[in-house]
Swiss-Prot record:
Basic residues composition-biased segments: 63-74
Membrane topology of this protein: Single-pass membrane protein
Domain of life of the organism encoding this protein: Eukaryota
Protein name: Spermatogenesis-associated protein 31D4
Cell compartments where the protein resides: Membrane
Biased composition (Low complexity): 152-163
Record Pfam families: DUF4599, FAM75
Keyword Transmembrane: yes
Lineage summary: Eukaryota, Metazoa, Chordata, Craniata, Vertebrata
Segments traversing the membrane: 29-49
Length: 917
């Protein structure tokens, strides 16, 4: 180790010495290496300056290549899913476009009517989720229309005339009628530049011609469409009418109106670039009722003839408004209501006004104020006040909801549900479909799950069926029929009430009130969406009174007579007489309506459609009525009563019990009263007998035993007094009578109690030793000096005698039955004595007697055994014969009788001594 350190020191010293050449070599090498590095750095900087554009291009190419590889790495399954989503989107667009003709059209696009779609979502006019979904769908359709119309736009530079044809809506009150639509063209010196349309252009146009609220004194002046010019072709000019007025259901128009320049206001006109060539087909499809029940048909005619022919379709919108609801002003206004006659005043449909509102408010967009809508509804309801004595005309919505394919409703529901779930999640769990509590007077806001049970029974006008029909359409069930209320081209329309619980459950949860007047063929009906008609119908349409509910007397309780005692139950014959009302069907008042209740839902059927009930059904209904009356009388349902009768029958009435014991005839159930089987009847009678026996014997045994410890025994005192009166010569007679009483009472007592008492007494184990100890004992000892004997010996002897008698009498079940108190008094003697001895801290007499009997068994002669056998045989013979005489008890010796007498006297003196102390 030391050698290595010396070598290192010498090497470092030579390297660091100034005379060494190693340091010179290192300095030269360092300078050369630094110069080379500097040159390399300069070369690198020059190269980077020249190669930076190339590297950037390479980087972009690399990124593009990565993107291409990512796109190529998409699996076939992802492509299939993307294609499926695109196909679903196309189907949805086509389905939404097929809902109805556009409200207004322009050469560049169409604004489709989403009102029907909005009504299909939910009937709540202020539902935020549904309004947003409708607005999104409307924007989507607007974009699609703009995309479809973009290729068809041609530049105006190629036009020869150099003038633009624009359409204005104007009116001259002095020259033409208010509803004439004059088509005019204004030449321009130069064509305007092409206009890039915004997606909200169609909505703006709809808002321009929206009807003013009912509370506004003056409607807004319509804006000419010249403010937003459209580059259009100079091919045949097209009309551009807008729904300036709500459509009117007109039977007759004033003859002063010229048909050449008049435009029928029964519908919302739609003119599109793709739907303007079916004029001949539209003419062929018209029928006699097309003017009143037909749908809007897009058609285009030359400018000089503005008469529009309507055709028939599945989706129609027919609305009526009175003259006072016209949107035009009195002077110089471009829109005013036509003079109409024969307006249908049969029924109010105030909620239909909300269906015109989406055209003006962008399908219930977010800027729509619910309070304004409610004020309009209330204003429309008060017809006499706001309309100057004119009743509100019908707002007829004949809708025949039919879908092209079964997949379309599911697709629509799935798309809307996604949007609804997202909006609900965004609103942090707020309930969609929240609505003011009081929409109008006497209106109750109920949930859809409580509608069937509460409101439907209350109004008797409800029937529910699902929103999406199984076969792609709703099967309208005609429920309520009324007499004809109006004439429309001499056709009587039937009014029917239907309650529809429809709408997507994720979009709204409250049941709302909108009313729809739907036409199906030649008949029409009022459809109450998640709501029931109330008393406002009777105020608004006196022609259509609300149907009177008919109630079956199924749950009307019969009051019990108050003169009956509390625990007394009615006899079955009395129950039958109370429970048999007259047949409910003849008692109903004459009415054309026929009511049927099904699970708490009452609905009315026309009399001709209601099937007649079979006799079995009538019997079943009568039996249900009787059963309900029985439940009201007895206070418990029949099922509970049967179960209680089987397991725990009620205590019978004491009055009925006494009567039954006097008559000695069991009460039988009449088979005609209740349909009971023979087994159930037998069980019922058996339980009744058992309860009567228990009621006869009074309180249970344990209660009597506890009461016997608190009060002295009267019967024992009476026996002791009789013994003292008659003297010692009658002891045998008294004892024989007492034993006879014990035997008779024991035979009448239930056997189970005898078994328990015999088991209790057999614990003393004195069966064979009693006779021995008593026969061998000196007879004169107790006769001459009974007071000198100890109380314990007397008690033990009396206990053994009593035990012998009880064991002898336990097997004898025959005999005359007497009262229970005598047996209880005899038995409580033993129990009270035991309790007293235990309480006083003395040794029980049974233990002392057992010791005494053991001592006496040592000196037992053989004669005693023979006497015991003879006595046992006599007891068996007496048990076999079962004769209730005192001679059978003669096997008791005088010694035993004296012991019993002494015991009774001492037991009788104890309570007296205790009281004196």
């Amino acid at each position: 180790m030391e050698n290595i350190l010396c070598f290192l020191n010498s090497y470092t010293e030579t390297g660091l010495s100034p005379d060494s050449h190693c340091l010179d070599i290192d300095l030269n090498f360092i300078c050369l290496s630094g110069l080379g590095l500097f040159i390399l750095y300069l070369f690198y900087m020059v190269l980077t300056l020249y190669s930076s554009p190339t590297e950037k291009n390479n980087d972009t190419q690399k990124h593009q290549g990565r993107a291409r590889r990512k796109r190529k790495s998409v699996t076939f399954k992802d492509r299939k899913s993307l294609q499926k989503e695109a196909e679903e989107e196309r189907k949805l667009h086509s389905f939404l476009k097929s809902f109805g003709p556009p409200v207004s059209c322009s050469p560049l696009g169409q604004h489709h009517d989403t009102t029907l779609f909005r009504r299909l979502l939910c009937p709540d006019p202020v539902c935020r989720v549904c309004n947003r979904a409708t607005a999104d769908i409307q924007r989507l359709l607007s974009w699609e229309s703009l995309k479809d119309a973009a290729p068809s736009v041609s530049p105006l530079a190629s036009s020869a005339s150099g003038a633009e044809s624009s359409f204005t809506l104007a009116s001259t009150p002095s020259a033409t009628t208010p509803e004439d639509l004059i088509l005019s063209s204004r030449p321009k010196p130069s064509p305007p530049p092409p206009l890039i349309l915004s997606p909200d252009l169609i909505t703006t146009l709809a808002d321009l011609f929206s009807p003013s609220p009912l509370r506004d004194p003056l409607p807004p002046q319509p804006v000419s469409p010249l403010d937003s010019k459209f580059p259009i072709d100079h091919s045949p000019p097209q009309q551009l009418p807008f729904p300036l007025l709500p459509p009117h259901h007109i039977e007759r128009v004033e003859p002063s109106l010229q048909p050449e320049a008049s435009l029928s206001l029964n519908t919302i006109f739609s003119f599109g670039s793709t739907l303007c060539q079916d004029i001949s087909q539209a003419v062929n499809r018209t029928d006699s009722c097309a003017r009143h029940h037909g749908p809007p048909t897009p058609s285009a005619l030359p400018p000089e003839d503005c008469t529009v022919t309507q055709s028939k379709s599945n989706l129609t919108v027919l609305k009526t408004f009175p003259e006072m609801l016209s949107l035009g002003g009195s002077g110089g206004s471009s829109t005013s209501a036509p003079t109409t006659k024969g307006i249908d005043h049969s029924c109010p449909a105030s909620s239909e006004f909300s269906w015109w509102q989406p055209h003006a408010k962008d399908s219930f967009s977010s800027n729509f104020v619910p309070s304004d809508f409610m004020e309009e509804l209330l204003t429309l309801h008060s017809s006499e006040a706001s309309l100057g004595g004119h009743s509100v005309a019908n707002i007829i919505q004949p809708v025949n909801i039919s879908f092209l394919s079964h997949d379309i409703p599911a697709l629509l529901e799935r798309q809307v549900k996604r949007r609804g779930d997202f909006l609900m999640w965004k609103e942090n769990g707020k309930k969609p479909g929240s609505f003011p509590t009081q929409l109008r007077p006497n209106y109750q806001l109920n949930s859809s799950r409580n509608m069937l049970t509460s409101t439907a029974v209350k109004h008797d006008l409800a029937e529910s069926f699902p929103f999406w029909a199984s076969k792609g359409k709703l099967e309208w069930q005609h429920i309520h029929q009324q007499p004809p209320y109006s004439k429309c081209f001499e056709d009587h329309l039937e009014q029917k009430y239907v309650q529809l619980f429809w709408g997507l459950p994720s979009l709204h949860s409250e049941s709302l009130h909108p009313t729809v007047f739907v036409q199906h063929g030649r008949s029409s009906m009022f459809v109450f969406f998640n709501g029931i008609t109330n008393t406002s119908m009777s105020h608004e349409s006196p022609v259509l009174p609300p149907p009177q509910p008919l109630f079956l007397p199924s749950t009307q309780p019969l009051p019990l007579p108050q003169t009956l005692p509390r625990g007394q139950s009615l006899h079955l014959t009395q129950v039958k007489s109370l429970a048999q009302p007259q047949s409910p069907f003849p008692a109903l008042p004459p009415s054309p309506l026929f009511l049927i209740r099904v699970c708490g839902v009452c609905f009315h059927r026309p009399q001709n459609e209601a099937r007649s009930l079979m006799p079995s059904e009538i019997n079943h209904l009568e039996w249900n009525v009787l059963q309900k009356v029985q439940e009201s009388v007895w206070g418990l349902p029949s099922v509970v009563q049967k179960s209680q009768e089987d397991f725990c029958p009620p205590a019978p009435n004491p009055v009925l019990v006494r009567k039954s014991f006097k008559v000695h005839v069991p009460i039988s159930i009449i088979p005609g009263d209740f349909p009971l089987s023979s087994e159930v009847r037998k069980k019922l009678e058996q339980h009744i007998r058992k309860r009567l026996i228990q009621r006869r014997w009074g309180l249970p045994r344990r209660i009597h035993e506890s009461l016997s410890l608190l009060r002295p025994q009267n019967k024992i005192s009476e026996l002791s007094v009789s013994e003292s009166i008659h003297g010692p010569l009658n002891i045998s007679l008294v004892e024989g009578q007492r034993c006879n009483v014990l035997k008779k009472s024991a035979s009448s007592f239930p056997r189970s109690f005898h078994e328990r008492s015999s088991n209790m007494l057999s614990m003393e184990n004195v069966g064979n030793y009693q006779g021995c100890s008593q026969e061998t004992a000196p007879k004169n000892h107790l006769l001459h000096d009974p007071e000198t004997s100890s109380d314990e010996d007397l008690r033990s002897n009396s206990e053994r005698d009593l035990g012998t008698h009880m064991m002898h009498l336990s097997g004898n079940d025959s005999g005359v039955r007497l009262g229970q108190k005598q047996l209880e008094n005899a038995l409580t003697v033993h129990l009270s004595k035991k309790f007293e001895e235990i309480n006083e801290g003395r040794m029980p007499g049974t233990v002392h007697s057992s010791w005494h009997s053991v001592k006496q068994t040592i000196c037992l002669p053989e004669k005693s055994h023979s006497q015991i056998k003879h006595r046992n045989l006599a007891a068996l013979v007496s048990e076999d014969h079962g004769v209730d005489t005192s001679q059978e008890m003669s096997f008791l010796s005088s010694n035993k009788q004296k012991m019993l007498e002494a015991h009774i006297k001492s037991f009788h003196m104890k309570p007296i001594l205790n009281l004196s102390i």
